[in-house]
Regions:
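A glycine/serine/threonine-rich, flexible loop-to-helix segment
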Residues: 49-69
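Catalytic tyrosine of NAD(P)H-dependent dehydrogenase/reductases that use a Tyr as the general acid/base
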Residues: 18, 26
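Conserved SDR Rossmann-fold cofactor-binding beta-strand/turn motif
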Residues: 41-51
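Residue(s) in the substrate-gating loop at a strand-loop-helix junction
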Residues: 5
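C-terminal helical subdomain
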Residues: 44-45, 64-107
Length: 108
């Protein structure tokens, strides 16, 4: 189970390095899936806005405020993502949910 981000499916100015790492997780996961099948299931969860400590590590004041406001208004919880992971891995071994994009309903 690999955790990526909705940023692995979109491109935004000022987000190039982060987006590149998330796009990379998707490609790496698909390669692993093909290399390790049929014995290993490889899955990617791509969360949107999740309430985490991320804003605590942002040093640019305007960006920090924007992220905090965005998360406060619409973020889902880490527990929500854990439930999705539990669902994905509980599927029968004969199937794999390769990619799951999970966003708050109100996230653009």
């Amino acid at each position: 189970m690999n955790i990526s981000s909705v940023a692995g499916r979109t491109a935004r100015p000022g987000n190039a390095v982060y987006a590149a790492t998330k796009w990379g997780i998707g490609g790496w996961s698909e390669s692993l899936r093909q290399e390790l099948q049929p014995d290993v299931r490889v899955m990617v969860i791509e969360p949107g806005a999740v309430a985490t400590e991320l804003a605590d590590h942002i040093t640019h004041a305007d960006t920090k405020v924007a992220v905090e406001q965005f998360v406060k208004e619409l973020a889902i919880t880490a527990e929500d993502i854990a439930e999705v992971i539990a669902f994905a891995i509980s599927r029968p071994r004969r199937m794999t949910l390769n990619e799951i994009l999970v966003r708050p309903t109100a996230q653009p």
